[in-house]
């Protein structure tokens, strides 16, 4: 007998679920429908777990989002029961947390960031590369550099598996640096202001797959499938691997294309496009109330 299909919504945050003011209000209709049908929502972001956990404090619904942080390198699951039956199994029965932060069971490799810092500082000294990492800046300098508040800087600095660096050298040296770190098992994701150094074994699709694996372990009677949404090249690997993919157009950067041909392009930007696309998907799969 075939297992019943259950969907998981996996989404990027900035310029996808969140609008320019970092609000998901325009997606409330669909988020309400997802809650009513017990369809899990997973935030898959470059943000730290601490940043996202702070954001969940304004979450309006009972079922909290599951969190994938630092581009797939960290995970967090709510440690309280998700249903009304307090005797049901909880996530702590299926995973071993490395930390518990504000009601979330957090999973990450406790050694990887130290390994990254040790390696890049060695390479910087040996090759005279010109860059500074988050760990090199004072809090005051990061506030001035990023425009974040003191509190936001503290949350952004709470990294478990990556190190953002500000490259201050030539493009030639940058390309050489990228090639060298590959030999140590690391890679670089270049963002608008910072380049994120992380382990090569992680990306957003790996984080998504880890979540699906744990759902299959906890709820083995269902066939778990994913709908993924994102707006930037950093999301592409996640969208390529999802069962159903939605590309959100980006006002500033344009619209990315995927290798797969069966993806959906949202009709609007950010949370409005997110809301309409997921709602249409739910209706097409008869998942909507």
Where are these regions (language model features)?
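Non-catalytic pre-domain segments flanking phosphatase-related domains
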Residues: 1-11, 36
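Mg2+-dependent phosphoryl-transfer enzymes with acidic/Ser/Thr/Gly-rich catalytic loops
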Residues: 2-5, 24, 195-289
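Hydrophobic "anchor" residues on beta-strands that sit immediately upstream
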Residues: 8-10, 66, 227
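Active-site phosphate-binding/coordination module
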Residues: 25-133
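Short, well-ordered alpha-helical microsegments
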Residues: 49-53, 174, 205, 235-236
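Short hydrophobic/aromatic-enriched beta-strand-loop microsegments
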Residues: 62-70, 151-153, 245-250
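Conserved acidic, metal-coordinating active-site core of Asp-based
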Residues: 119, 123-227
């Amino acid at each position: 007998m075939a297992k019943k299909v259950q969907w998981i919504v996996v989404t990027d945050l900035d310029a996808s679920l969140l609008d320019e003011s970092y609000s998901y209000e325009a997606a409330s209709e669909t988020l309400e429908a997802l809650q009513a049908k017990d369809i899990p929502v997973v935030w898959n972001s470059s943000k730290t777990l601490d940043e996202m956990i702070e954001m969940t404090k304004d979450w309006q619904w009972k079922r909290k989002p599951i969190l994938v942080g630092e581009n797939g390198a960290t995970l967090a699951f709510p440690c309280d029961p998700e249903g009304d039956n307090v005797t049901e199994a909880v996530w702590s029965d299926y995973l071993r947390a490395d930390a518990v932060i504000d009601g979330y069971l957090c999973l990450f490799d406790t050694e990887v960031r130290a390994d990254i810092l040790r390696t890049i500082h060695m390479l910087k000294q040996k090759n005279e590369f010109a860059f500074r990492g988050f760990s090199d800046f004072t809090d005051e300098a990061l506030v001035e550099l990023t425009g974040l508040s003191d509190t936001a800087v503290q949350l952004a600095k709470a990294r478990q598996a990556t190190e953002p660096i500000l490259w201050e050298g030539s493009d030639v040296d940058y390309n050489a640096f990228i090639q060298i770190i590959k030999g140590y098992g690391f890679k670089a994701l270049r963002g608008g202001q910072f380049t994120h150094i992380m382990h090569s074994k992680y990306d957003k699709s790996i984080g998504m797959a880890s979540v699906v694996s744990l759902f299959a372990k906890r709820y083995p009677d269902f066939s778990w499938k994913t709908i993924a949404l994102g707006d930037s090249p950093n999301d592409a690997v996640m969208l390529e691997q999802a069962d159903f993919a939605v590309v959100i157009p980006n006002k500033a950067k344009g619209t990315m294309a995927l290798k797969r041909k069966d993806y959906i392009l949202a009709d609007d930007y950010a949370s409005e496009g997110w809301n309409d696309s997921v709602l249409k998907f739910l209706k097409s799969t008869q998942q909507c109330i």
